[in-house]
Amino acid sequence: VIDMARRLGAMLPPDQMVVLTGACGGYPDALAAGFRSRGGHVVGFSPGSDLDDHIAGGSPVNNCDEMLFGFGGLIERQVALVRRASVVLALGGNVGTLSELCIAVKMRKPMVIVEGFPGIGPRFLGLLDQLDCYPPPRIRSVAAEDAASAVAVFAAAAAEEAG
């Protein structure tokens, strides 16, 4: 599954976007590695106060071209990350991803959930069905098995948001 995230990252068009991540391991790091392998630029939003704090927390540093620090905590980092994003892409994930998706709903950010990754991403779609969100969230779901479609949907959402 990590390889699938790396492949998705390698398919994103580096001349059309910058990838923002929470600068953590797992899917975000793999996607960033794939994106950078094609010359893409990755900005990591660290929950740490500085690089030493980031490394001490066990977070990777190899796949970010820039690292931003000093958000005042994890939740503040999540808000800053989502606020800066044009489109939110979720590959599985855990509590941090859930929080970022909820922030994206409140900020009316377009979201792309890639199904086929273990974690909260696909479950979030079911959760939204149970809620009465107004206005309704701008969310699209694509299957991870069709990486080209996932990338196309994400790139289209980013282009649409850019105007």
PLM ranges: what are they?
Residues M4-A10, Q16, G22-L101:
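Acidic/glycine-enriched connector segments
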Residues A5-L8, R36-S37, V105-M107, L128-Q130, ...:
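Short, solvent-exposed amphipathic alpha-helical segments in soluble enzyme
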Residues V19-L20, V112:
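Hydrophobic residues within beta-strands of alpha/beta enzymes
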Residues G40-H41, F45-G48, I55-G72, L125-A159:
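Structural recognition of alpha->loop->beta junctions
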